[in-house]
Swiss-Prot record:
Annotated Mg(2+) 2 binding sites: E38, H153
Name of this chain's protein: 3,4-dihydroxy-2-butanone 4-phosphate synthase
EC main group: lyase
GO biological processes: riboflavin biosynthetic process
PANTHER family in alphabetical order: 3,4-DIHYDROXY-2-BUTANONE 4-PHOSPHATE SYNTHASE (PTHR21327:SF38), GTP CYCLOHYDROLASE II-RELATED (PTHR21327)
Organism from which the protein derives: Shewanella sp. (strain W3-18-1)
One Pfam family hit: DHBP_synthase
Cofactor or coenzyme needed: Mg(2+); Mn(2+)
Annotated residues for binding of Mg(2+) 1: E38
Keywords tagged on the record: Lyase, Magnesium, Manganese, Metal-binding, Riboflavin biosynthesis
Organism taxonomic ancestry: Bacteria, Pseudomonadati, Pseudomonadota, Gammaproteobacteria, Alteromonadales
Length: 217
């Protein structure tokens, strides 16, 4: 059903291209995963261009659990251990310990403070000592190989940033309805139309990456 509902937005390749263009312009994208998986849509921004207004939108329109997707090597460089030793979550979402910037924040909860924390974490040469633990930003470790390894929003986010030529770090949060329930694809499409945000799927990113590999081959 996802593909049929998204058909008005073009092919899978065209939807990804629209998303990449939005990210390059400092705007957000909406990414929906497989119907037989979480069947949820995440609002995603590039970490390097994230603004306070965009963070406020994530907090206001989404679940409130704002996550910072990072590649494995960045997680290791920041010495961020897993949140739990044995991850028993349904889809193995790789949360690390939560973080806070050590400098430039007050309580760490405000939109501005969360942006400060994210900028501190993704800075070139960022050190473990730049971050306090725990905090109000939740890093997620992406699997090497991206969506071709794991079809999750974390990997999709990193893939999109790399395909857009941006730093491999993105911020996401699950879109919710006004009544607090999770937004599904019809609501995600309506939300995208309301805010002029392109919509694509994890499957689209898989197809896009496979097409690139086929062209190289």
């Amino acid at each position: 059903m996802n593909q049929s509902l998204l058909a008005p937005f073009g092919t899978a390749i065209e939807r990804v291209e629209a998303g990449l263009n939005a990210l390059r312009q400092g705007q957000g994208v909406l990414v929906v995963d497989d119907e037989d998986r979480e069947n949820e849509g995440d609002l995603i921004f590039a970490a390097q261009t994230l603004t306070n207004a965009q963070m406020a939108m994530l907090i206001r329109e989404c679940s409130g659990i704002v996550c910072l997707c990072l590649p494995d090597e960045k997680v290791k460089a920041l010495e961020l251990p897993p949140m739990v030793e044995n991850n028993s979550s349904q889809y193995g979402t790789a949360f690390t310990v939560s973080i806070e910037a050590k400098v430039g924040v007050t309580t760490g909860v405000s939109a501005a403070d969360r942006v400060t924390t994210i900028k501190a974490a993704i800075a070139d040469g960022a050190k473990p000592s730049d971050l306090a633990r725990p905090g109000h930003v939740y890093p997620l470790r992406a699997q090497p190989g991206g969506v071709l390894t794991r079809r999750g929003h974390t990997e999709g986010t990193i893939d999109l940033m790399q395909l857009a030529g941006l730093k491999p770090a993105g911020v996401l949060c699950e879109v919710t309805n006004p009544d607090g329930t999770m937004a599904r694809l019809p609501e995600i499409i309506a939300f995208g139309a309301q805010h002029n945000i392109p919509v694509l799927t994890i499957e689209d990113i898989v197809l896009y990456r496979k097409s690139l590999l086929a062209n190289v081959g």
